[in-house]
Regions:
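Conserved ABC transporter NBD signature motif
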Residues: 155-163, 175
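Conserved ABC ATPase signature
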Residues: 230-234
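Helix-to-loop junction immediately C-terminal to a conserved catalytic motif
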Residues: 147
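Q-loop/switch helix immediately C-terminal to the Walker
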Residues: 183, 189-201
């Protein structure tokens, strides 16, 4: 072909091969993933079957209309399938707006010392409940009672109207109660994909189903860019998000207990985690959060308990608590005014 007949405007194609040993944050940003043709984000043990291709236009040249339309339809359809499958689960669960968890007159002593005294509260389907109080108030003990690490001396715990007092922790997990503790989570030398895969392969034999599940979760929460990032290289907020996905990925979770999910995070990460928790609720989960900082989380809470010395001192929606002098006294002490 002579020079005159050659197209004047061409796309410059840059081919980047994935390197699992190097940082993959830049490689796997969303705009790069969108450029993968007809390929969902399904990885085989972090090994790409073919190099990713990023196309950069130097001068705008229209593509053939039919081809462009086809690609767009494929991408939109794939994204829609991933999102809709998960959202439908949440919508189905949220139809039941009654109580999913009921704690009635629970008491517990440890080493002869009363820790909890006649605690009662309930959690509705799709609700976010805040459990607040100073150190030693009994928040962790209450979490351990709900999840089944320890058993109450008196009182009753119900999940969907079924008494679960005597059920051990693994049976409560099978019924849909999961706890994410503050200092426990991922294998630091493993990527987000590997950490999720390690849990899922214990429950799912089909490799393709595992990869599809991982793709759905990461896509739904916009975390595809972390797929090849090792846990040790994640920010605090990213680490907690992947840790949470690890808890909910392999079972039908109904109640998720989060132990101080905002601890040691900067303001931007706190904002990101709060958005993440709201997205968990949209999936149909009911969430209980422990924290010391009422003002950091009050905007995402539906209801709140303030515990002091093993007793529920205040219960109510945050907008009511923040205006109540008695509540502020129990939470922040005397002499404090907002």
């Amino acid at each position: 072909m002579d020079e005159e007949n050659k197209p004047k405007n061409k796309k410059q194609k840059i081919t980047i091969k994935a390197n699992t040993q190097a940082s993959s944050k830049l490689l796997l940003k969303r705009e790069y993933i969108v450029e993968q043709k007809q390929k969902p984000l399904l990885l085989n043990k972090i090994k790409f079957q073919e190099p990713l291709t990023l196309t950069k236009e130097i001068e705008a040249t229209p593509k053939p209309q039919a081809k462009e339309t086809k690609n767009i339809k494929i991408k939109k359809t794939a994204a829609k399938i991933v999102s809709t499958n998960i959202i439908k689960l949440g919508e189905q669960d949220k139809k039941n707006k009654g109580k999913i968890l009921t704690v009635s007159n629970i008491s517990k002593s440890l080493g002869g010392k009363p820790i909890l005294k006649n605690i009662s509260f309930s959690l509705n389907h799709g609700q976010i409940l805040g459990l607040l109080g100073p150190n030693g108030a009994g928040k962790s003990t209450l979490f351990n009672l709900v999840v089944g690490k320890i058993f109450p001396d008196r009182g009753e715990i119900k999940l969907n109207n079924e008494v679960i007092n005597e059920l051990p922790i693994h049976k409560r997990a099978l019924k849909g109660i999961s706890l994410l503790e503050q200092h426990k989570g991922l294998f630091g030398s493993m990527t987000a994909y590997e950490n999720l895969y390690a849990i899922l392969e214990l429950h799912i034999e089909d490799k393709n189903k595992i990869e599809t599940k991982i793709s759905q979760l990461l896509s739904y929460f916009g975390l595809q860019y972390l797929v090849n990032v090792k846990a040790n290289n994640m920010s605090g907020g990213e680490y907690k998000k992947i840790s949470t996905l690890q808890r909910i990925c392999n079972k039908d979770i109904k109640v998720l207990l989060l132990d101080e999910p905002m601890a040691a995070l900067d303001p931007l990460s706190i904002s990101s985690i709060k958005k993440f928790i709201l997205e968990l609720r949209e999936m149909g989960l009911s969430v209980i959060i422990t924290d010391h900082n009422f003002f950091a989380i009050q905007d995402i809470l539906d209801n709140c308990l303030i515990i002091r010395d093993g007793n529920v001192m205040v219960e109510g929606p945050p907008r009511t608590i923040i205006k109540d002098e008695k509540a502020i006294k129990y939470y922040l002490g005397t002499g404090f005014k907002i």
